[in-house]
Protein backbone atom coordinates (compact mmCIF):
# COMPACT_ATOMS: atom_id res chain seq x y z
CA UNK A 1 0.00 0.00 0.00
CA UNK A 2 2.81 2.40 0.88
CA UNK A 3 4.53 1.73 -2.45
CA UNK A 4 1.32 2.41 -4.38
CA UNK A 5 0.66 5.60 -2.42
CA UNK A 6 4.20 6.85 -3.05
CA UNK A 7 3.94 6.12 -6.78
CA UNK A 8 0.66 8.01 -7.12
CA UNK A 9 2.05 10.97 -5.18
CA UNK A 10 5.15 11.12 -7.38
CA UNK A 11 3.00 10.96 -10.52
CA UNK A 12 0.77 13.80 -9.30
CA UNK A 13 3.77 15.88 -8.24
CA UNK A 14 5.46 15.37 -11.61
CA UNK A 15 2.30 16.43 -13.42
CA UNK A 16 2.12 19.58 -11.30
CA UNK A 17 5.80 20.51 -11.70
CA UNK A 18 5.85 20.45 -15.52
CA UNK A 19 3.49 23.41 -16.06
CA UNK A 20 5.21 25.26 -13.22
CA UNK A 21 8.56 25.00 -15.01
CA UNK A 22 6.98 26.38 -18.18
CA UNK A 23 5.42 29.26 -16.24
CA UNK A 24 8.81 30.38 -14.90
CA UNK A 25 9.94 31.33 -18.43
CA UNK A 26 7.04 33.73 -19.05
CA UNK A 27 7.60 37.51 -18.84
CA UNK A 28 6.03 39.04 -15.75
CA UNK A 29 4.06 42.29 -15.82
CA UNK A 30 2.87 44.28 -12.83
CA UNK A 31 -0.60 45.80 -12.65
CA UNK A 32 0.72 49.37 -12.91
CA UNK A 33 2.83 48.48 -15.95
CA UNK A 34 -0.07 46.61 -17.54
CA UNK A 35 -2.37 49.61 -17.09
CA UNK A 36 0.20 51.97 -18.59
CA UNK A 37 0.96 49.79 -21.59
CA UNK A 38 -2.61 48.74 -22.31
CA UNK A 39 -3.97 52.29 -22.13
CA UNK A 40 -1.46 53.53 -24.68
CA UNK A 41 -2.39 50.70 -27.06
CA UNK A 42 -6.17 50.90 -26.72
CA UNK A 43 -7.69 52.28 -29.99
CA UNK A 44 -10.53 54.00 -28.16
CA UNK A 45 -8.09 55.83 -25.89
CA UNK A 46 -5.89 56.85 -28.82
CA UNK A 47 -9.00 58.18 -30.58
CA UNK A 48 -10.03 60.06 -27.43
CA UNK A 49 -6.60 61.70 -27.18
CA UNK A 50 -6.94 62.74 -30.82
CA UNK A 51 -10.36 64.24 -30.11
CA UNK A 52 -8.84 66.35 -27.32
CA UNK A 53 -6.21 67.67 -29.74
CA UNK A 54 -8.85 68.41 -32.39
CA UNK A 55 -11.09 70.17 -29.87
CA UNK A 56 -8.18 72.27 -28.61
CA UNK A 57 -7.42 73.51 -32.13
CA UNK A 58 -11.11 74.26 -32.72
CA UNK A 59 -11.08 76.29 -29.50
CA UNK A 60 -8.05 78.30 -30.67
CA UNK A 61 -9.74 78.95 -34.01
CA UNK A 62 -12.91 80.16 -32.29
CA UNK A 63 -10.85 82.66 -30.28
CA UNK A 64 -8.69 84.00 -33.10
CA UNK A 65 -11.63 84.96 -35.35
CA UNK A 66 -12.40 87.71 -32.83
CA UNK A 67 -8.86 89.12 -32.93
CA UNK A 68 -7.14 88.36 -36.22
CA UNK A 69 -8.48 88.63 -39.79
CA UNK A 70 -8.09 85.80 -42.24
CA UNK A 71 -5.10 86.39 -44.53
CA UNK A 72 -4.53 84.93 -47.98
CA UNK A 73 -1.69 85.51 -50.46
CA UNK A 74 -2.00 84.78 -54.16
CA UNK A 75 0.28 85.25 -57.16
CA UNK A 76 0.15 84.20 -60.80
CA UNK A 77 2.34 84.58 -63.89
CA UNK A 78 0.94 84.53 -67.43
CA UNK A 79 2.61 84.24 -70.83
CA UNK A 80 0.62 85.96 -73.58
CA UNK A 81 0.88 84.97 -77.24
CA UNK A 82 0.59 87.41 -78.89
CA UNK A 83 1.58 90.12 -76.42
CA UNK A 84 -1.26 91.48 -74.32
CA UNK A 85 -1.74 94.77 -72.48
CA UNK A 86 -0.02 94.67 -69.07
CA UNK A 87 -1.64 96.76 -66.35
CA UNK A 88 1.69 97.12 -64.61
CA UNK A 89 3.76 98.53 -67.48
CA UNK A 90 0.77 100.00 -69.37
CA UNK A 91 1.93 98.47 -72.65
CA UNK A 92 1.65 95.13 -74.44
CA UNK A 93 3.84 92.50 -72.80
CA UNK A 94 4.50 88.82 -73.40
CA UNK A 95 4.64 88.19 -69.64
CA UNK A 96 2.41 89.53 -66.90
CA UNK A 97 2.76 88.89 -63.17
CA UNK A 98 0.14 89.63 -60.52
CA UNK A 99 0.38 89.37 -56.71
CA UNK A 100 -2.47 89.85 -54.26
CA UNK A 101 -2.81 90.00 -50.48
CA UNK A 102 -6.30 89.79 -48.95
CA UNK A 103 -7.35 90.38 -45.35
CA UNK A 104 -10.89 89.42 -44.40
CA UNK A 105 -12.62 90.12 -41.10
CA UNK A 106 -16.21 89.23 -40.22
CA UNK A 107 -17.74 92.23 -38.47
CA UNK A 108 -21.11 90.63 -37.82
CA UNK A 109 -22.19 87.04 -38.35
CA UNK A 110 -25.53 86.98 -36.61
CA UNK A 111 -24.01 85.61 -33.41
CA UNK A 112 -22.33 82.68 -35.13
CA UNK A 113 -18.85 83.54 -33.83
CA UNK A 114 -20.13 83.66 -30.25
CA UNK A 115 -22.03 80.41 -30.76
CA UNK A 116 -18.93 78.73 -32.16
CA UNK A 117 -16.93 79.95 -29.17
CA UNK A 118 -19.45 78.32 -26.82
CA UNK A 119 -19.58 75.15 -28.92
CA UNK A 120 -15.79 74.79 -28.99
CA UNK A 121 -15.59 75.21 -25.20
CA UNK A 122 -18.23 72.52 -24.68
CA UNK A 123 -16.54 70.25 -27.22
CA UNK A 124 -13.19 70.61 -25.45
CA UNK A 125 -14.76 69.81 -22.09
CA UNK A 126 -16.49 66.81 -23.64
CA UNK A 127 -13.24 65.65 -25.24
CA UNK A 128 -11.43 65.76 -21.89
CA UNK A 129 -14.28 63.80 -20.31
CA UNK A 130 -14.14 61.32 -23.19
CA UNK A 131 -10.40 60.88 -22.69
CA UNK A 132 -10.95 60.15 -18.99
CA UNK A 133 -13.77 57.77 -19.83
CA UNK A 134 -11.67 55.92 -22.41
CA UNK A 135 -8.73 55.68 -20.00
CA UNK A 136 -10.78 54.09 -17.24
CA UNK A 137 -12.61 51.85 -19.71
CA UNK A 138 -9.26 50.54 -20.95
CA UNK A 139 -8.08 50.17 -17.36
CA UNK A 140 -11.21 48.20 -16.46
CA UNK A 141 -10.65 45.75 -19.32
CA UNK A 142 -6.98 45.44 -18.40
CA UNK A 143 -7.75 44.75 -14.75
CA UNK A 144 -10.34 42.19 -15.82
CA UNK A 145 -7.70 40.35 -17.89
CA UNK A 146 -5.09 40.75 -15.14
CA UNK A 147 -7.36 39.35 -12.43
CA UNK A 148 -8.41 36.52 -14.75
CA UNK A 149 -4.78 35.40 -14.91
CA UNK A 150 -4.31 35.57 -11.14
CA UNK A 151 -7.62 33.83 -10.48
CA UNK A 152 -6.76 31.21 -13.09
CA UNK A 153 -3.47 30.46 -11.36
CA UNK A 154 -5.21 29.96 -8.03
CA UNK A 155 -7.92 27.81 -9.60
CA UNK A 156 -5.22 25.67 -11.21
CA UNK A 157 -3.62 25.31 -7.78
CA UNK A 158 -6.98 24.25 -6.33
CA UNK A 159 -7.44 21.72 -9.14
CA UNK A 160 -3.95 20.30 -8.63
CA UNK A 161 -4.52 19.88 -4.92
CA UNK A 162 -7.76 18.10 -5.74
CA UNK A 163 -5.86 15.70 -8.02
CA UNK A 164 -3.28 15.05 -5.30
CA UNK A 165 -5.96 14.40 -2.68
CA UNK A 166 -7.84 12.13 -5.07
CA UNK A 167 -4.67 10.15 -5.80
CA UNK A 168 -3.94 9.75 -2.12
CA UNK A 169 -7.50 8.67 -1.36
CA UNK A 170 -7.42 6.18 -4.22
CA UNK A 171 -4.32 4.57 -2.73
CA UNK A 172 -5.98 4.39 0.68
CA UNK A 173 -9.19 3.03 -0.82
CA UNK A 174 -7.42 0.31 -2.77
CA UNK A 175 -5.52 -0.75 0.33
CA UNK A 176 -8.78 -0.95 2.28
CA UNK A 177 -10.37 -3.02 -0.48
CA UNK A 178 -7.40 -5.40 -0.54
CA UNK A 179 -7.54 -5.78 3.24
CA UNK A 180 -11.29 -6.43 3.13
CA UNK A 181 -12.15 -3.30 5.12
CA UNK A 182 -14.04 -1.78 2.17
CA UNK A 183 -15.96 -2.96 -0.86
CA UNK A 184 -14.83 -2.72 -4.48
CA UNK A 185 -17.14 0.22 -5.18
CA UNK A 186 -15.04 2.40 -2.87
CA UNK A 187 -12.02 2.20 -5.16
CA UNK A 188 -14.27 2.71 -8.20
CA UNK A 189 -15.75 5.86 -6.66
CA UNK A 190 -12.28 7.17 -5.87
CA UNK A 191 -11.01 6.35 -9.36
CA UNK A 192 -13.94 8.29 -10.82
CA UNK A 193 -13.12 11.24 -8.55
CA UNK A 194 -9.48 11.14 -9.70
CA UNK A 195 -10.55 11.17 -13.36
CA UNK A 196 -12.91 14.08 -12.78
CA UNK A 197 -10.22 15.97 -10.88
CA UNK A 198 -7.79 15.52 -13.77
CA UNK A 199 -10.44 16.72 -16.23
CA UNK A 200 -11.05 19.82 -14.14
CA UNK A 201 -7.30 20.46 -13.97
CA UNK A 202 -7.06 20.30 -17.76
CA UNK A 203 -9.94 22.76 -18.12
CA UNK A 204 -8.40 25.20 -15.64
CA UNK A 205 -4.97 24.99 -17.28
CA UNK A 206 -6.56 25.66 -20.66
CA UNK A 207 -8.43 28.67 -19.29
CA UNK A 208 -5.22 29.97 -17.70
CA UNK A 209 -3.29 29.71 -20.98
CA UNK A 210 -6.01 31.68 -22.77
CA UNK A 211 -6.06 34.30 -19.99
CA UNK A 212 -2.29 34.78 -20.24
CA UNK A 213 -2.49 35.19 -24.00
CA UNK A 214 -5.34 37.67 -23.61
CA UNK A 215 -3.37 39.72 -21.11
CA UNK A 216 -0.30 39.59 -23.35
CA UNK A 217 -2.32 40.89 -26.28
CA UNK A 218 -3.78 43.63 -24.10
CA UNK A 219 -0.34 44.94 -23.03
CA UNK A 220 1.25 44.60 -26.46
CA UNK A 221 3.29 41.45 -25.87
CA UNK A 222 3.85 38.94 -28.64
CA UNK A 223 2.77 35.99 -26.50
CA UNK A 224 1.51 35.03 -23.04
CA UNK A 225 2.56 37.01 -20.00
CA UNK A 226 2.47 36.30 -16.29
CA UNK A 227 0.67 38.63 -13.88
CA UNK A 228 2.67 39.68 -10.84
CA UNK A 229 0.94 38.71 -7.58
CA UNK A 230 -1.03 41.37 -5.72
CA UNK A 231 -1.36 42.08 -2.04
CA UNK A 232 -3.72 39.45 -0.67
CA UNK A 233 -5.26 41.96 1.76
CA UNK A 234 -8.43 43.41 0.27
CA UNK A 235 -9.65 46.93 1.08
CA UNK A 236 -11.86 46.75 4.15
CA UNK A 237 -14.14 49.53 2.96
CA UNK A 238 -14.54 52.48 0.63
CA UNK A 239 -13.19 55.92 1.57
CA UNK A 240 -16.51 57.67 0.85
CA UNK A 241 -20.18 57.14 1.58
CA UNK A 242 -22.77 56.11 -0.98
CA UNK A 243 -24.35 59.57 -1.08
CA UNK A 244 -20.94 61.18 -1.54
CA UNK A 245 -20.16 58.76 -4.36
CA UNK A 246 -23.46 59.57 -6.09
CA UNK A 247 -22.83 63.31 -5.80
CA UNK A 248 -19.26 63.01 -7.03
CA UNK A 249 -20.26 60.86 -10.00
CA UNK A 250 -23.00 63.31 -11.01
CA UNK A 251 -20.58 66.26 -10.86
CA UNK A 252 -17.30 64.80 -12.11
CA UNK A 253 -18.03 61.36 -13.52
CA UNK A 254 -16.74 61.19 -17.12
CA UNK A 255 -19.97 59.77 -18.56
CA UNK A 256 -22.11 62.51 -17.05
CA UNK A 257 -19.63 65.29 -17.80
CA UNK A 258 -19.51 64.19 -21.41
CA UNK A 259 -23.30 64.10 -21.68
CA UNK A 260 -23.59 67.65 -20.33
CA UNK A 261 -20.86 68.89 -22.65
CA UNK A 262 -22.54 67.24 -25.63
CA UNK A 263 -25.80 68.97 -24.78
CA UNK A 264 -24.08 72.36 -24.51
CA UNK A 265 -22.32 71.82 -27.82
CA UNK A 266 -25.57 70.82 -29.51
CA UNK A 267 -27.35 73.89 -28.12
CA UNK A 268 -24.53 76.12 -29.39
CA UNK A 269 -24.73 74.50 -32.82
CA UNK A 270 -28.45 75.25 -32.86
CA UNK A 271 -27.76 78.92 -32.07
CA UNK A 272 -25.14 78.98 -34.81
CA UNK A 273 -27.76 77.83 -37.30
CA UNK A 274 -30.09 80.61 -36.17
CA UNK A 275 -27.42 83.09 -37.22
CA UNK A 276 -28.00 82.20 -40.86
CA UNK A 277 -31.31 84.12 -40.68
CA UNK A 278 -29.52 87.39 -39.87
CA UNK A 279 -27.42 89.63 -42.13
CA UNK A 280 -23.64 89.22 -42.24
CA UNK A 281 -21.15 92.09 -42.54
CA UNK A 282 -17.59 91.55 -43.75
CA UNK A 283 -14.69 93.98 -44.12
CA UNK A 284 -12.12 93.02 -46.75
CA UNK A 285 -8.83 94.73 -47.55
CA UNK A 286 -6.99 93.79 -50.74
CA UNK A 287 -3.60 94.82 -52.08
CA UNK A 288 -2.83 94.05 -55.76
CA UNK A 289 0.43 94.57 -57.68
CA UNK A 290 1.10 94.16 -61.45
CA UNK A 291 4.35 93.86 -63.43
CA UNK A 292 6.09 91.74 -66.06
CA UNK A 293 8.34 89.99 -63.51
CA UNK A 294 8.27 88.74 -59.92
CA UNK A 295 7.95 90.49 -57.49
CA UNK A 296 5.55 92.91 -59.25
CA UNK A 297 6.14 96.55 -58.29
CA UNK A 298 5.13 98.61 -61.34
CA UNK A 299 1.51 99.20 -60.36
CA UNK A 300 -0.07 98.76 -56.93
CA UNK A 301 -3.70 99.08 -55.98
CA UNK A 302 -5.44 98.91 -52.62
CA UNK A 303 -9.10 98.07 -52.04
CA UNK A 304 -11.17 98.25 -48.87
CA UNK A 305 -14.59 96.64 -49.15
CA UNK A 306 -17.48 96.52 -46.72
CA UNK A 307 -19.90 93.80 -47.76
CA UNK A 308 -23.29 93.15 -46.20
CA UNK A 309 -25.27 90.08 -47.19
CA UNK A 310 -28.75 89.04 -46.17
CA UNK A 311 -29.86 85.54 -47.21
CA UNK A 312 -33.49 85.58 -48.25
CA UNK A 313 -34.28 82.21 -49.79
CA UNK A 314 -32.22 79.04 -50.28
CA UNK A 315 -34.86 76.43 -51.03
CA UNK A 316 -35.34 75.43 -47.37
CA UNK A 317 -31.69 74.51 -46.86
CA UNK A 318 -31.49 76.73 -43.76
CA UNK A 319 -34.69 75.24 -42.39
CA UNK A 320 -33.41 71.72 -42.99
CA UNK A 321 -30.10 72.45 -41.24
CA UNK A 322 -31.91 74.18 -38.37
CA UNK A 323 -34.26 71.22 -37.94
CA UNK A 324 -31.33 68.80 -37.79
CA UNK A 325 -29.58 70.98 -35.21
CA UNK A 326 -32.74 71.17 -33.11
CA UNK A 327 -33.16 67.39 -33.20
CA UNK A 328 -29.52 66.89 -32.18
CA UNK A 329 -30.02 69.32 -29.29
CA UNK A 330 -33.18 67.53 -28.12
CA UNK A 331 -31.49 64.12 -28.35
CA UNK A 332 -28.49 65.39 -26.37
CA UNK A 333 -30.80 66.81 -23.71
CA UNK A 334 -32.74 63.54 -23.45
CA UNK A 335 -29.48 61.57 -23.19
CA UNK A 336 -28.19 63.83 -20.43
CA UNK A 337 -31.45 63.61 -18.48
CA UNK A 338 -31.49 59.81 -18.81
CA UNK A 339 -27.94 59.54 -17.47
CA UNK A 340 -28.67 61.89 -14.59
CA UNK A 341 -31.72 59.84 -13.62
CA UNK A 342 -29.64 56.66 -13.64
CA UNK A 343 -26.60 57.98 -11.77
CA UNK A 344 -27.84 56.80 -8.36
CA UNK A 345 -28.72 53.40 -9.76
CA UNK A 346 -25.33 52.96 -11.44
CA UNK A 347 -23.31 54.14 -8.45
CA UNK A 348 -25.40 52.13 -6.00
CA UNK A 349 -24.98 48.98 -8.09
CA UNK A 350 -21.19 49.41 -8.15
CA UNK A 351 -20.97 50.54 -4.52
CA UNK A 352 -23.13 47.74 -3.13
CA UNK A 353 -21.46 45.33 -5.52
CA UNK A 354 -18.14 46.05 -3.86
CA UNK A 355 -19.46 45.80 -0.30
CA UNK A 356 -21.30 42.58 -1.15
CA UNK A 357 -18.29 41.02 -2.83
CA UNK A 358 -16.08 42.07 0.09
CA UNK A 359 -18.46 40.45 2.59
CA UNK A 360 -18.74 37.33 0.46
CA UNK A 361 -14.94 37.09 0.38
CA UNK A 362 -14.82 37.15 4.19
CA UNK A 363 -17.56 34.52 4.41
CA UNK A 364 -15.82 32.38 1.79
CA UNK A 365 -12.59 32.48 3.78
CA UNK A 366 -14.46 31.08 6.78
CA UNK A 367 -16.12 28.48 4.55
CA UNK A 368 -12.71 27.28 3.38
CA UNK A 369 -11.51 26.82 6.95
CA UNK A 370 -14.67 24.88 7.85
CA UNK A 371 -14.53 22.76 4.69
CA UNK A 372 -10.85 21.96 5.23
CA UNK A 373 -11.47 20.84 8.80
CA UNK A 374 -14.52 18.84 7.72
CA UNK A 375 -12.45 17.08 5.06
CA UNK A 376 -9.71 16.29 7.57
CA UNK A 377 -12.25 14.75 9.95
CA UNK A 378 -13.95 12.74 7.21
CA UNK A 379 -10.59 11.55 5.93
CA UNK A 380 -9.58 10.32 9.37
CA UNK A 381 -12.95 8.65 9.91
CA UNK A 382 -12.79 6.89 6.54
CA UNK A 383 -9.34 5.52 7.25
CA UNK A 384 -10.68 4.30 10.57
CA UNK A 385 -13.71 2.76 8.86
CA UNK A 386 -16.16 5.04 10.70
CA UNK A 387 -17.74 6.64 7.59
CA UNK A 388 -18.55 5.85 3.98
CA UNK A 389 -16.72 6.81 0.82
CA UNK A 390 -19.64 9.02 -0.21
CA UNK A 391 -19.22 11.20 2.88
CA UNK A 392 -15.51 11.52 2.15
CA UNK A 393 -16.10 12.48 -1.48
CA UNK A 394 -18.75 15.00 -0.49
CA UNK A 395 -16.36 16.61 1.99
CA UNK A 396 -13.65 16.77 -0.65
CA UNK A 397 -15.97 18.38 -3.22
CA UNK A 398 -17.17 20.90 -0.67
CA UNK A 399 -13.57 21.85 0.03
CA UNK A 400 -12.88 22.33 -3.67
CA UNK A 401 -16.04 24.42 -4.11
CA UNK A 402 -15.20 26.56 -1.09
CA UNK A 403 -11.65 27.24 -2.30
CA UNK A 404 -12.87 28.13 -5.80
CA UNK A 405 -15.58 30.40 -4.37
CA UNK A 406 -12.98 32.21 -2.26
CA UNK A 407 -10.79 32.83 -5.30
CA UNK A 408 -13.71 34.16 -7.32
CA UNK A 409 -14.96 36.36 -4.47
CA UNK A 410 -11.56 37.95 -3.89
CA UNK A 411 -11.08 38.99 -7.49
CA UNK A 412 -14.73 39.94 -7.89
CA UNK A 413 -14.11 42.44 -5.08
CA UNK A 414 -11.22 44.00 -6.97
CA UNK A 415 -13.16 44.07 -10.24
CA UNK A 416 -16.22 45.74 -8.74
CA UNK A 417 -13.91 48.35 -7.20
CA UNK A 418 -12.47 49.03 -10.66
CA UNK A 419 -16.01 49.43 -12.00
CA UNK A 420 -16.86 52.01 -9.35
CA UNK A 421 -13.64 53.89 -10.09
CA UNK A 422 -14.55 53.98 -13.79
CA UNK A 423 -17.88 55.62 -12.90
CA UNK A 424 -16.24 58.19 -10.62
CA UNK A 425 -13.31 58.84 -12.94
CA UNK A 426 -10.64 58.56 -10.23
CA UNK A 427 -8.77 56.00 -8.18
CA UNK A 428 -10.14 55.43 -4.70
CA UNK A 429 -6.91 53.78 -3.57
CA UNK A 430 -4.12 55.46 -5.63
CA UNK A 431 -1.38 53.68 -3.71
CA UNK A 432 -2.64 50.31 -4.96
CA UNK A 433 -2.11 51.27 -8.60
CA UNK A 434 1.65 51.53 -8.08
CA UNK A 435 2.70 48.06 -7.01
Predicted regions and their residues:
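Periplasmic alpha-helical coiled-coil/stalk elements that build and connect Gram-negative outer-membrane
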Residues: 29, 134-248, 350-353, 357, ...
Amino acid sequence: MLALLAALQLQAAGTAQLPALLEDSLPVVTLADALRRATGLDPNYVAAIGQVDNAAWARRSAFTVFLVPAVSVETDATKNLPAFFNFGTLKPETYSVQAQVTLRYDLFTGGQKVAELSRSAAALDGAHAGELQARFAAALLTEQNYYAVLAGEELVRVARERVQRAAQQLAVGRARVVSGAAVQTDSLQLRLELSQAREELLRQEFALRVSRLTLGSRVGAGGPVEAAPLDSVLPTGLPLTLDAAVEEAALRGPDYRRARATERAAAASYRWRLGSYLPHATLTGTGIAFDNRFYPTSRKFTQLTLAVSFPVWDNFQRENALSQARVNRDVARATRETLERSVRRDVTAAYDGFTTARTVADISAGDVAVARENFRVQQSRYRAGATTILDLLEAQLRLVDAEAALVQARYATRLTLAGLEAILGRRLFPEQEVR
